[in-house]
């Protein structure tokens, strides 16, 4: 009798799971139908709208949560991302603009959001095309061009490449590219390194023209490019270690330490407690800008309370907190949003998803990986992510555009073809790494540091997640009645239950 009851219980749970999975698949199908209905599909690249659902079901991690703004935006952003996957005679690319723009290189390629494309795309199951995309920038983008294309914009390619390989290990690929990453770093030094050791950049080539502290002709030392170059040096050192090249490991480890100290000594404003731009002539620019949060994206600042106080500016409505998201400059700045027409490309205050996603990543790193992290909390992070998700709208329909009015949510380029489906930021990666808290490693360890609380969500699931060649499924279910996997946090690896715990807290699983 006990055996029969056990079998019946197992059948009940199995049928409940199948039913829940079918409901999720139906929900995704409904989302895609709605997205397709709203789109005139002016440009078709590798994956058409009619194939979008099948591609998504085969390739993306499936996600479910009680917050419908976040859930819908998660699928909308994957639906939008696949629009930009494009074949070329020199490999598969990921475009930034869906329609051709004048400042692009061949095949409508632009390097500005390259790092974002790799961080987002690394979670796609069939993602080998991203290696072609990386190789395009390393070996093909500048050929037969009248001006440099790869270095047309600041980049954190080595860091993003390592991030990609933390999800999809390939040490041979890393070894084959290491010397070229070294050469490219040295090229950046020749082009942008100042006598004091910091890097300078025009704001337009940081992807943030008409900024408060920058310009198109001034050689200012910005927190953005210096953080990128620090992150790149750290990544190259780690790649060198992975492929047993101690000489390059020592070189870049030392370089990263030196650059880090230069940033701390030269770009940190002790009085305003913020990382700022150092002017070509003179000291620090007085204004706080969102690029001052980027150092935490790369874990550059030490774990000290003084540095953490910079994050007090994020929830402050006189700082960066606006009704529709994170502003690019502090709102108390007297010249906030006074440059240009207010409808061109101006990063003197308006919301720019490129930096919104960077800021969220920096904040999540601060909360997850720093001990002295009391300036903000997980509720502040959730508010920013929810706001970011909710901002994806125009006329009541899902939309992602170029940049946005911080008070009204108006997309300032309107429904302009160049703005539509603008692929300039991450979103799925924010949900997977920052909110749910999957922290990819170079070794076969699945580490999770959740930053969403049971007060916000009493359930969520993230399934068919490919990580280190394993199929991961994660379920959070307070009552156990949603997924019938048991109460609490349950994790499956290749279909086998590998961990279950009552609370939504940090955990690790060895995948060997």
Predicted regions and their residues:
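Non-catalytic carbohydrate-binding regions of carbohydrate-active enzymes
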Residues: 243-279, 308-470
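The feature captures the catalytic groove of carbohydrate-active enzymes
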Residues: 24-44, 51-54, 143-156, 186-254, ...
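Extended glycan-interaction surfaces of carbohydrate-active proteins
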Residues: 71-106, 123-147, 187-221, 261-351, ...
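Alpha-helical support elements that line or immediately flank enzyme active sites
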Residues: 101-131, 291-303, 356-369, 375-381, ...
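Substrate-binding cleft of carbohydrate-active enzyme catalytic domains
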Residues: 24, 69-72, 76-83, 106-143, ...
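C-terminal beta-sandwich/jelly-roll accessory domains of carbohydrate-active enzymes
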Residues: 458-512
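Bacterial Sec-dependent N-terminal signal peptides
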Residues: 1-22
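Acidic/polar, glycine-enriched structural segments that form the non-catalytic walls/loops
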Residues: 19-105, 171-173, 182-187, 238-247, ...
């Amino acid at each position: 009798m006990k055996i029969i009851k056990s079998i019946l219980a197992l059948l009940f749970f199995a049928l409940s799971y199948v039913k829940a999975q079918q409901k999720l698949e139906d929900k995704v199908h409904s989302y895609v139908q709605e997205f397709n209905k709203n789109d005139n599909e002016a440009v078709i690249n590798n994956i058409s709208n009619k194939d979008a659902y099948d591609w998504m079901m085969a390739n993306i991690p499936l996600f479910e949560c009680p917050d419908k703004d976040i859930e819908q935006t998660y699928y909308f952003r994957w639906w939008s991302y696949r629009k930009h996957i494009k074949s070329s005679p020199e490999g598969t690319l990921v475009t930034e603009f869906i329609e051709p723009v004048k400042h692009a290189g061949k095949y409508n390629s632009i390097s500005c959001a390259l790092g974002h494309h790799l961080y987002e795309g690394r979670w796609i199951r069939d993602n080998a095309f991203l290696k072609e995309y990386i190789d395009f920038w390393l070996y093909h983008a500048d050929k037969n061009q009248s001006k440099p294309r790869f270095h047309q914009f600041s980049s954190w390619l080595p860091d993003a490449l390592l991030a990609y390989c933390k999800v999809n290990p390939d040490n041979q690929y890393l070894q084959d590219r290491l010397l070229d990453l070294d050469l490219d770093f040295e090229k950046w030094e020749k082009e942008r390194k100042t006598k004091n050791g910091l890097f300078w950049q025009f704001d337009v080539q940081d992807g943030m023209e008409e900024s408060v502290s920058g310009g198109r002709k001034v050689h200012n030392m910005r927190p953005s490019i210096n953080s990128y170059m620090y992150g790149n040096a750290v990544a190259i050192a780690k790649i060198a270690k992975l492929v047993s090249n101690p000489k390059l490991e020592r070189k870049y480890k030392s370089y990263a330490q030196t650059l880090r100290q230069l940033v701390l000594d030269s770009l940190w404003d002790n009085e305003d407690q913020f990382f700022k731009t150092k002017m070509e002539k003179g000291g620090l620019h007085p204004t706080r800008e969102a690029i001052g949060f980027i150092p935490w994206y790369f874990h550059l600042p030490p774990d000290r309370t003084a540095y953490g106080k910079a994050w007090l500016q994020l929830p402050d409505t006189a700082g960066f907190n606006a009704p529709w998201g994170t502003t690019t400059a502090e709102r108390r700045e007297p010249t906030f949003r006074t440059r240009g027409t207010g409808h061109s490309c101006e990063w003197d205050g308006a919301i720019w998803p490129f930096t919104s996603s960077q800021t969220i990543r920096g904040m999540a790193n601060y909360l997850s990986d720093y001990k002295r992290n009391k300036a903000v909390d997980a509720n502040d992070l959730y508010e920013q992510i929810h706001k970011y998700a909710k901002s994806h709208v125009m006329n009541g329909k899902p939309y992602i555009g170029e940049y946005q009015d911080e008070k009204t949510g108006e997309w300032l380029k309107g429904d302009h073809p160049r703005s539509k489906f603008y692929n300039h930021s991450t979103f799925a990666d924010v949900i997977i790494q920052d909110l749910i808290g999957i922290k990819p490693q170079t070794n076969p360890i699945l580490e999770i540091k959740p930053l969403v609380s049971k007060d916000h969500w009493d359930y969520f699931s993230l399934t068919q997640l490919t990580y280190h060649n394993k199929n991961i499924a994660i379920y959070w279910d307070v009552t156990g009645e949603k997924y019938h996997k048991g109460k609490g946090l349950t994790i499956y690896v290749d279909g086998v239950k590998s961990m279950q715990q009552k609370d939504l807290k940090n955990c690790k699983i060895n995948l060997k």
